[in-house]
Amino acid sequence: MKIERLNGGDFLIAPTENSWESAGTSNSGAVMLPSTPELLALISRAAGQDLTKDKRLQEYVVICLYSAVGVMPGNDIRTQRRGLAIFSPRLELCYRHPLPVLSPDFSPDSIDLKGIEDARVTYTDGKFFIWYCGYNGKRGVPCCAWSEDLIHWVKQNPLAGPLGEHENKDHVIFPEPFQGRWWMLHRPWGYEIPDANNYVIRLGSAPTPYGPWQDEGEILRGIAHPDKKISWVGGGAAPLKIADGKYFVLYHNGAFSHDDYRWYEACTCLVDLNNFIPGQPENIVSHRLEPFMAPATEEETNQNKRISIIFPMHAHVYEGKLYFLYGAGDKATCGACVDWQEVKDIMDF
């Protein structure tokens, strides 16, 4: 399978000299929406400039809430904020906002003091949702926030329901409800459920996107490799709908080698919610492909941290190609594309 790294493999969103985004711009979520006059007007208001005439945005708009690590003038707390970038459906960067659009709460007991981390993006009922791990320097809990204009946000820290009561990460919801409920992929640890410390992907559900979210059980765990000391899995991009209740899922596999070098690669599977049986949620997973894409470039390797990373955060299909954004080397955001039919042929769906 031939995967093309966009922009010659270079970063699509790189750190800048702005102090709030100077230390890293990795793991950036996004959502692609059809271009409408209302949406183009909305992003133009958010940008403070007219984007309605940009020919690259006439069919679809990709709205990215990117990771931005650094400090703000007058605030010496190094943390992770969210910046705003607008891409074309081919992942051409069309606009990048000069200031963060979402920042942590800096009160002493804040859940997200040290970071709004690994934020996936979805859109429903006229609202943009981001699903992120709120990190306070000691523990990370699942959170979300929503906005109608990409500038003003309402936070729910932590998620409502049992899933928000314990440490949890890499959570993202499916794009629409199925059989009267909303569904979520999540990965808890330190949780009062069997084998949670093995970092497995589990299924959650709720009556609304606002919760209350409950756990439905394990659906996917890492595959043991003889050359790795430990392996695990975690969520990636928001699932892509391919049929009623059936989704293409791009997730990540992580591992430590025996000399403690860390490795992340992109993987794929299919999830069919039609097959969900309470108490047997693993029946929904099939057609697993590991790896789908592995680190291979300088951008995807970070020798200072002894880590190589491809961390998928967004995916969409446009003009017969699967496009996706990923965190590269724990440094910045990259993009890639691959023939969608080839993916379907290899995964046999």
Predicted features, each with a name:
Residues 119-120, 171-174, 236-238, 311-317:
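Beta-rich, blade/repeat-based domains predominating
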Residues 1-114, 122-168, 176-231, 241-305, ...:
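Beta-rich carbohydrate-recognition and catalytic domains
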Residues 299-302, 310-314:
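Short glycine-rich, acidic/polar surface loops and turns
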